[in-house]
């Protein structure tokens, strides 16, 4: 029986001097112990998801906690059967969360250590979900929401998080005077975004402390009132949250049946994320449109070594054809 893999999700807003040098040092240590994952280090803090066996992840947590700046850093731990990452990346960036403010001036950015929304534990957040007078706002990207979200949460008409501040400004009159509660995967985006809402003049702003990941592990709420699965930015793609009455809300792109399996369109110039069963991925060569299915650089065709004849037969089976110049 193979050893369990632990996946660590964490962040901390804290001032890091010489952050670029620290990022290089951090990467060196991670590689020395065989850790895999993706970490962002900025002047304002650290944000990461890493994976490894018990011994490796314990070494990493002990090393991080030995630094007084991160002595109280909160690691959220998942147990999995396989690695969530294939390589180790540690990158320096100006910010660990970019709000996309129109002036793009880092000096005007929000410091969550000074301004942030009120923390709500899972029980308090569940109560907020059931309160008709509370607005619950999902702060994640559109494709994250489509896989799973809290029941009754507002889905902003945006494609990604950077568009959220402008959307809120455009819709301010709808909930300016109401209690607003925000949530995200692990909490890092909400720390900054809820602070921005406070600065914008919203009177009562709360945030799910520890994010969806913590809500799903809470022994009392057990993820109840969450529909679907939670999107994660690693090889797992999704993880279960609701352990009371789980549901599947996302639908297969091709036939509309319940499906939580995300894939990227095989056309590298499209790369659209779609839900697709393995059967439909095979049937439609992972292309989201006739053009993508017949694209000369279709990655599904390349990855599976399909001959031109096999490719053409797949398309003919669904009433499409392969142009003569493609794959010739």
UniProtKB/Swiss-Prot annotation:
UniProt keyword terms in alphabetical order: Oxidoreductase, tRNA processing
InterPro entries linked to this entry: Rhodanese-like_dom, Rhodanese-like_dom_sf, Rhodanese_C, TrhO, TRHO_N
GO biological process: tRNA modification
MF terms (GO), sorted A to Z: oxidoreductase activity, acting on paired donors, with incorporation or reduction of molecular oxygen
SUPFAM superfamilies, alphabetized: Rhodanese/Cell cycle control phosphatase
Pfam family, one: Rhodanese_C
EC number annotated for this UniProt entry: 1.14.-.-
Cystine pairs: none
Active site (record annotation): 184
Swiss-Prot/TrEMBL catalytic activity: uridine(34) in tRNA + AH2 + O2 = 5-hydroxyuridine(34) in tRNA + A + H2O
Domain of life from the UniProt record: Bacteria
Rhodanese domain ranges (all copies): 130-224
Similarity remark: Belongs to the TrhO family.
NCBIfam families in alphabetical order: PRK00142.1-3, PRK00142.1-5
Function: Catalyzes oxygen-dependent 5-hydroxyuridine (ho5U) modification at position 34 in tRNAs.
Listed name of the protein: tRNA uridine(34) hydroxylase
The organism of origin for this protein: Streptococcus pyogenes serotype M6 (strain ATCC BAA-946 / MGAS10394)
């Amino acid at each position: 029986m193979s050893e369990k893999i632990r996946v660590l999700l964490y962040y901390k807003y804290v001032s890091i001097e010489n952050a670029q040098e620290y990022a290089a040092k951090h990467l060196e240590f991670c590689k020395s112990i065989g850790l895999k994952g993706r970490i962002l280090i900025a002047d304002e803090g650290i944000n990461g998801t890493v994976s490894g066996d018990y011994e490796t992840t314990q070494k990493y947590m002990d090393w991080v906690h030995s630094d007084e700046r991160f002595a109280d850093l909160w690691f959220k731990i998942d147990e999995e059967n396989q690695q969530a990452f294939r390589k180790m990346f540690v990158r320096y960036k100006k910010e660990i969360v970019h709000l996309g403010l129109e002036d793009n001036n880092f000096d005007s950015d929000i410091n969550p250590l000074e301004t942030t929304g009120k923390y709500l534990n899972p029980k308090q957040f569940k109560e907020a979900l059931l309160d008709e007078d509370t607005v619950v706002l999902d702060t994640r990207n559109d494709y994250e929401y489509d896989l799973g979200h809290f029941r009754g949460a507002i889905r902003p008409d945006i494609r990604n998080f950077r568009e959220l501040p402008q959307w809120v400004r455009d819709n301010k009159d709808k909930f300016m005077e109401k209690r607003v509660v925000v949530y995200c995967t692990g909490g890092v985006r909400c720390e900054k975004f809820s602070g921005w809402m406070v600065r914008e003049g919203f009177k009562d702003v709360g945030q799910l402390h520890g994010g969806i990941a913590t809500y799903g592990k809470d022994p009392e709420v057990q993820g109840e009132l969450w529909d679907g699965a939670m999107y994660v930015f690693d090889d797992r793609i999704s993880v279960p949250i609701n352990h009371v009455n789980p549901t599947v809300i996302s639908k297969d792109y091709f036939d509309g049946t319940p499906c939580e399996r995300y894939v990227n369109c095989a056309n590298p110039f499209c790369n659209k994320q779609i839900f697709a069963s393995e059967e439909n991925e095979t049937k439609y060569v992972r292309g989201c449109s006739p053009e993508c299915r017949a694209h000369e650089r279709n990655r599904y065709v390349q990855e599976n070594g399909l001959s031109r004849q096999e490719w053409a037969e797949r398309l003919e089976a669904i009433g499409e054809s392969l142009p003569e110049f493609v794959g010739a």
